[in-house]
Amino acid sequence: MKEKSQIDDIDRSVYDIRDEEHDAYRMQEGLTPAIVQKLSDEKGDPAWMQEFRLHALQIYNEMPLPDWGPSIEGLDIDHIATYVRPNTKMQNDWKHVPQDIKDTFERLGIPQAERKSLAGVGAQYDSELVYHNVKDEVAAQGVVYTDMESALTGEYADMVRKYFMKLVTPHDHKFAALHGAVWSGGSFVYVPKGVQASIPLQSYFRLNAKGAGQFEHTLIIVDEGASLHFIEGCSAPKYNVANLHAGCVELYVKKGAKLRYSTIENWSKNMYNLNTKRALVEEGGTIEWISGSFGSHVGCLYPMSVLKGDNSRMEFTGVTFAGHGQNLDTGAKVVHIGKNTSSYMNTRSISKSGGISTFRSSVVVQKGASGAKSAVSCQSLMLDSESRSDTIPAMDIRTRDAAVGHEAKIGSISNEAVFYLMSRGMSEEDARALIVSGFADNVSKELPVEYAVEMNNLIRLEMKGSIG
């Protein structure tokens, strides 16, 4: 009889909750000008956004699919519903959210997290936010945290128009163009000059609909001398058809400002996660990326930082766990433009049961970026002989005094370490899970404690059945 381990106490079903679909509106599948026009009408877009969407669709139709990275041949946009509106309007009081949707988010811990440690929460269900709230003390500082649709047509409409898809343009790649055509939902954040937002904000994205896509847009502007920590969570139940996530994140870090952007992605194993994230950092500014990627069938995610200002800096800390049937192609990019800029990438990748984990790094030091410093470190842990781990670095250095380095290591779990932990009373499965959690502590130690616990639980879930 198999010994019961601590891992057996972790239940995957909390993430695989499937609500019965009671959509107020579901767009027909596929992607045509008529569908994009109808989506725009449904959302009440201003004229410039409607024109933007149709132009992005034209770019999408003209651009080829990427000829590198994991295969996405199982994804057919003709069988994806690009817009699914839930059966509720956005609420700022949790008790007014419909019970079935509320039950899902409560099982995922969203209300508890808000009460314990968050300054504000946005919760998106399929294509629209169903809940958004910011604490009074944060709003009193002048911090703006609202849904993108309200920002698009309200007080901050001019700011949205100035920044929307200027950093990630529809010409960037085919799925950026798709996003520009059918985006819906997401969050708008503005932190005024000099404001230190000491408590994190969070957005949580849940895709419940079968055969649908989620295309939220996150736009954050941290003004001069200000600071913010923003946390993003994602999940979906598993279906036997493809789902698509092609969100977009644009971050503007002004002079002397600091932004930490943390993400824990736990998409279901039928998800194609083709997300695009980018930050523009001005003089003396800092962008910190914290990234944990655990879900999706195919994942392509490479947050990019443009260090435009002198003395600007970037840090990327990430962990990726690829299990059975997963091909996760992740990494980070940085472009050094200003003088005396610095970047550091510290990543860990774990693969088991035939999973494929690929780390891509891109470091570009432009001609005028004198004194640039960049270091890349990638460590990989393979848990069996069927799995695969690749590291693909790219460097383009155009100044003579740059200091750039890359380090990559690959290894497996030591039998001696497992034996030692078992001698202290652990089961073999728990011992292996503890070692893997320790390997990924580069990310967990950077998260607030509630999210570090959640990440370690996800690792323990992935480790179920890793022996025998």
Regions found by a protein language model. Give the residues of each.
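N-terminal amphipathic, basic helical "cap/leader" segment at the start of enzyme domains
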Residues: 2-10, 25-172, 176-177, 346-349
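Short acidic (Asp/Glu) and glycine-rich catalytic loops that position anionic groups and cofactors
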Residues: 18, 33-37, 396-397
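Conserved beta-strand/loop scaffold segments within soluble protein domains that form the structured core
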Residues: 131-133, 137-426, 440-468
